[in-house]
Amino acid sequence: PYDTYGFLHEVHRREAVSWFILAADRNRPFDIGLNPKLDVLPSLVESLSNHPGGGDVCWHPGYKAVDDAHVCQHESDRFWSWTSTNRNMVRAHFLRSEPSRDWIRWEAMGVAHDASLGWARDVGFRAGTSRPFQAYDVEGERPLALTIHSVAAMDSALKEGLGWRPERAAEEMDRLISVVSE
């Protein structure tokens, strides 16, 4: 049920797509999917990088990587060793992310963009803005070399968090898109 890449390729064939790929060791129930130790995942990454509409293949840190710096380094090294990956953007688990910690870590790793700021059980912009903004280290009192891209909605929030059927989710997403496009 998780293999929707062909469907997504077809639906977005004329649009640039950012793919966020989990390269974590399998850790049920949170990090499941393709085994990063097998050739199939790096092959998928290469295939996604050749998307007709363009786009990037970016790293999605696993559940354990958010708390453990060694796991984080191992995963990032693994992911970025594969051809055709984008080192400039990440998207971590919403519920596990801590901006005060993670933004500093991403900057130190050379990541320039983070798309991890969003709601796991609701829609809307967690930072109060739909526009990208520069991250700031409150404790260190300095701007960071990291741009934050707020996420307006996640599929699981629409289905499980809000209990919306696909038709309702489509209506609400259309409304949200019209608000931010003004």
Question: Where do the PLM segments sit?
Answer:
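Active-site-adjacent pocket scaffolds in enzyme catalytic domains
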Residues: P1-V11, L38, P42-E46, R78-S181
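Short, well-structured secondary-structure segments
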Residues: P1-Y63
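A short acidic (Asp/Glu
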Residues: R28-L34, A69-C72, P99-I104, R126-A127
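Glycine-rich phosphate/ribose-binding loops and adjacent secondary-structure elements
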Residues: H51-P52, W59, H70-C72, N86, ...
